[in-house]
C-alpha cells in the first residue's frame, strides 16, 4: 500500500499458494522464494503479518505457523522489519469490531481503499486489512 497526498492506494494484491503436491520443505521454500521476489519488487519499508492464533485444529495452526515462519524469514533476509498484529486487533482497526467476520473485513477493505470490487479471495482482503491495521496504528505516517 502507498500513501500519496493523503490518498491510500493498493498497488497490487493477491495470494501466494504453494503447490499442494510438493513436500513440506518445497512448499515452504516456494513461499519463501515468492515472498522474497515480492519484497524485492515492491521494496516495502515494513512487513506486517497476522500473529498466531489459537485453533481447535492443531494441524491447520501448525501449517499456518510454518508459513508465517517462511514469510518472516524472507523479511529478515531482505532486511525489512516485520511487525505482527492479532486477528482481533486487525478486525477492530479496520471494521471497528474485533469479532467481525471475514466478509465484513472484506467489505470495509474495499470501501477504505476505494476498490472497484471486493478483493478476492478472502486471504487477499485479510492481507490488505493487516496493512491497513499497520497504517492505522502508525497514524498513516
Q: How would you label these PLM feature ranges?
A:
Residues 1:
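Sequence context surrounding c-type heme c attachment/ligation sites in exported
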Residues 4-141:
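Phosphate- and other anionic-substrate recognition elements at nucleic-acid/protein interfaces
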